[in-house]
Curated annotation (Swiss-Prot):
GO terms for molecular function: cellulase activity. The active site is at 176 (proton donor), 284 (nucleophile). It comes from the Eukaryota. It comes from Robillarda sp. (strain Y-20). Glycans are attached at residues 93, 140, 200, 237, 289, 331. Active towards carboxymethyl cellulose. Pathway: Glycan metabolism; cellulose degradation. Residues 1-17 form the signal peptide. Keywords: Carbohydrate metabolism, Cellulose degradation, Glycoprotein, Glycosidase, Hydrolase, Polysaccharide degradation, Signal. This is Endoglucanase 1. Gene3D superfamilies: Glycosidases. It catalyses: Endohydrolysis of (1->4)-beta-D-glucosidic linkages in cellulose, lichenin and cereal beta-D-glucans. Belongs to the glycosyl hydrolase 5 (cellulase A) family.
């Protein structure tokens, strides 16, 4: 009986310890370019620390030292890294890159956590003034102003060459491609993967699908991600799928109430991942401080923990420039954010105090990966508590 119980305990431990990486999305690096009149060039290149910033080191300290998070998804804009005057590719704005690298190094070197590099561009380039809809679709050969698939690969080859010695850096190929052919999403992803590996970078890659890379829609529609996204090739077999999943009625994350059951809506994706022997991160999810979201957010986090296909997550969103504004709930936009110390517009506690601490923080695994390279198979789980 002792052997039976020992084997059972081992199986149960393996089944429950599937989350290796947990944290927050750091959103502010993409700020400062939006224009109500969709005026190209608005906010470019922008003033670092005034129009945009990547992280608050003090907030990262709180999330690592007190909340014991080991993953941060750091947003940036392609147009700031690769100015439109020179085009998408290997020519970087070195001043901007240095600011970005400083943030990534603080997370990974100083704090010993992991960082996802997040080009927050919706598979578009040259005009972020009306995101997520402005700009030319990368690889669209019918648009003479569009950056090419080859240029996208060149960009990723250059970026990877600058981080290939940092095993704690994860390459998130693109935020939320949408309204384009899934075959083009695959082609762009593959160009990036090929260039990253050619740059002698063995880092973990996370790869998006089409239709805002939504988990609920992964197998749906006439051109679903599920039909093609399993055809990518990575010679190192170190690429995971990047998923976003919100719980409001239209899956946008823009409403106060959570009404979409994650177990039901992720079932088809989870089956697809299992069938194709793939792993996934959910790098965007979140909700308001409503009762419905307080009930359903744990359902999503527990679903990931209970299904071995999911190995990491980042909640949307923290970031130094949110102020009282909210990364959720466009019908009530000033509830604060997941940034420590955030407050709502009326001075009451923000989403960090009303959602993160009471709802999400208790579900952060007590053991996460704190050493070794990020990978689809994870690493040794240890506690920092």
């Amino acid at each position: 009986m002792k052997l039976v119980f020992s084997a059972l305990a081992s199986l149960l431990s393996g089944a429950s310890a599937t989350i290796y990486y947990a944290g927050v999305a750091e959103s502010s690096g993409e700020f400062g370019v939006w224009s109500a009149t969709q005026t190209p060039g608005t906010g470019l290149p922008g003033r670092f620390g005034v129009d945009y910033a990547f992280i608050s080191e003090a907030a990262v300290d709180v999330h690592v030292d007190q909340n014991h998070l080991n993953l941060f998804r750091v947003a940036f804009l392609l147009e700031r890294m690769c100015p439109p005057a020179t085009g998408l590719g290997a020519a970087f704005n070195e001043t901007h890159f240095d600011y970005f690298k400083e943030a990534v190094d603080y997370i990974t070197v100083t704090k010993g956590a992991y960082a996802i590099l997040d080009p927050h561009n919706y598979m578009r380039y040259n005009d972020p003034s009306y995101q997520p809809f402005s700009g030319s679709v990368i690889g669209n050969t019918s648009d003479s102003t569009a950056a090419t698939t080859e240029q996208f690969g060149e960009f990723w080859g250059e970026l990877a060459s600058r981080f290939n010695d940092n095993e704690r850096v994860i390459f998130g190929l693109m935020n939320e491609p949408h309204d384009m052919a899934t075959s083009l999403v695959l082609a762009n992803n593959q160009a990036a993967i090929d260039a990253i590996r050619a740059a002698n970078a063995s880092n973990l890659i996370i790869m998006p699908g089409n239709s805002w890379t939504g988990g609920h829609s992964w197998t749906e529609g006439s051109d679903p991600s599920s039909a093609l996204l399993n055809q990518f090739k990575d010679p190192l077999n170190n690429t995971a799928i990047d998923i976003h999943e919100y719980l409001d009625y239209d899956f946008s994350g823009g409403h106060l109430e959570c009404v979409s059951d994650p177990e039901t809506n992720l079932a088809a994706l989870t089956a697809w991942l299992k069938e194709n022997n793939l792993k996934a991160f959910i790098t965007e999810f979140g909700g308001s401080n409503s009762t419905s979201c307080q009930e359903m957010l744990p359902d999503l986090i527990n679903y990931m923990a209970d299904n071995a296909e999911y190995i990491g997550w980042t909640a949307w969103a923290a970031g130094p420039f949110w102020g009282p504004n909210s990364p959720c709930c466009t019908n009530s936009t000033q509830l604060g954010s997941l940034e420590p110390g955030s407050t709502a517009v009326d001075g009451s506690p923000g989403l960090y105090d009303t959602v993160w601490l009471p709802v999400i923080q208790p579900l952060v695994p007590t053991e996460l990966q704190w050493s070794g390279p990020a990978s689809i198979s994870g690493g040794e789980l240890t506690s920092r508590a």
